[in-house]
A protein has these predicted regions:
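Short catalytic/metal-binding and nucleic-acid-binding patches
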Residues: 1-195
């Protein structure tokens, strides 16, 4: 059935009028379709990646090479989801990008005016980065299925959407980093845990 806005009341979870290509820090969560466990196991409060989880990790690190305006910060691959912090920076040389501070002026604050009047675009918006990451990981996973390395998936590898949070302060950044680092320890209490 084709999309019909009168029937399919799909509500956007993005900030209205926010320009997701602006430089700043973004906390992102991407879940597997159906929350199926695909990327490894949590053993004694530590995430043990299987070959599919290692592939996800590899493609996350590859994002920086593909997008000049991107830094990949803290992340964790979990059995059925992936958390990370992307930093969109001004387009610069790799050496200049390494010198960009993590917080302070680069923290992204929600605009009070429509995005079109703000300027300051750094490059591709967040959704383009996520789409590329999902495409690369899905294609690699499909190759693994064809080679008998990964189990097949039904419909798609990832959920259609993703969750994002614009990081607006040092305190928020610190809390999110701690959340990411402690995620394996909290696995059995996680709402995404489905044995």
């Amino acid at each position: 059935m084709p999309y019909d806005p009168d029937i399919h009341h799909r509500r956007s979870i993005r900030l209205k009028d926010y320009d997701y290509s602006l430089r700043g820090l973004y906390f992102v969560t991407i879940c597997t379709h159906g929350h199926i466990l695909r990327f490894g196991d949590v053993v004694e409060d530590a995430m043990i990646l299987n070959s599919a989880g290692q592939m996800i990790e590899r493609w996350y690190k590859e994002c920086e090479r593909h997008f000049d305006n991107l830094r990949c910060l803290d992340y964790v691959v979990m059995p059925n989801h992936f958390h990370c912090i992307f930093q969109i920076v001004e387009t610069a040389s790799p050496k200049e990008r390494q010198q960009v501070p993590l917080v302070g002026a680069d923290l992204c604050v929600c605009p009070k005016t429509p995005a079109s009047s703000l300027g300051g675009h750094a490059g591709p918006p967040l959704h383009t980065i996520i789409q590329w990451f999902k495409t690369m990981t899905t294609n690699d996973y499909i190759r693994g299925v064809k080679n008998g390395v990964f189990p097949p998936f039904h419909v798609r590898l990832w959920q259609r959407n993703y969750y994002e949070h614009v990081i607006r302060s040092q305190h928020s950044y610190d809390e999110i980093v701690e959340y990411i680092r402690n995620n394996p320890k909290q696995w059995y209490n996680d709402k995404l845990f489905h044995p």
